[in-house]
């Protein structure tokens, strides 16, 4: 630490006032950009929350359908929503279980018999063609289309006496 402190002091003493001012204003520009990015990020989250709340108001049977992927967890985890369906960024559609705000566990997970299984096994066990993946922790599935994702969520609801 002593050596680096001395080096810094030498640089400060050896640099001109103009160099120090230039460095300061460069730092101000970087700090300004960071702050602007943080503000824009917060505004984007607020806009997403509004879209998520609108989708929740239009939901049925605890299944919320989003028009695109949006950060939805903050807006839904204290509601009675059970599933969120949205277009996957990788193609097809995804369905996720909403977690309980106290336990942080899925309110209604996908079946154990689907968990981590290959597509053929999931399709055979579910009777639904087009479910391509179920996470081993049972909180997420992927499907070929929105209708298949909806059907999978409805099947879970029905099998648990919720439909």
How would you describe each model-predicted region?
Residues 1-12:
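Single conserved hydrophobic/aromatic residue that forms the stacking wall/gate
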Residues 10-12, 16, 49:
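Serine/threonine-rich low-complexity intrinsically disordered regions
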């Amino acid at each position: 630490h002593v050596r680096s402190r001395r080096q810094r002091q030498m640089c400060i003493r050896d640099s001109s006032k103009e160099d120090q001012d230039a460095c300061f204003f460069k730092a101000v520009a970087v700090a300004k950009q960071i702050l602007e990015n943080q503000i824009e990020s917060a505004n984007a989250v607020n806009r997403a929350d509004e879209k998520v709340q609108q989708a929740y108001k239009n939901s049925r049977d605890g299944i919320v359908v989003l028009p695109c992927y949006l950060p939805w967890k903050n807006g839904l985890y204290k509601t009675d929503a059970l599933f969120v369906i949205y277009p996957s960024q990788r193609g097809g559609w995804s369905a996720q279980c909403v977690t309980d705000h106290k336990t942080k566990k899925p309110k209604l997970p996908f079946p154990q018999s689907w968990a981590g299984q290959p597509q053929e096994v999931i399709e055979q066990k579910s009777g639904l063609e087009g479910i391509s993946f179920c996470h081993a922790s049972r909180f997420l599935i992927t499907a070929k289309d929105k209708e298949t994702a909806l059907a999978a969520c409805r099947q879970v609801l029905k099998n648990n006496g919720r439909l």
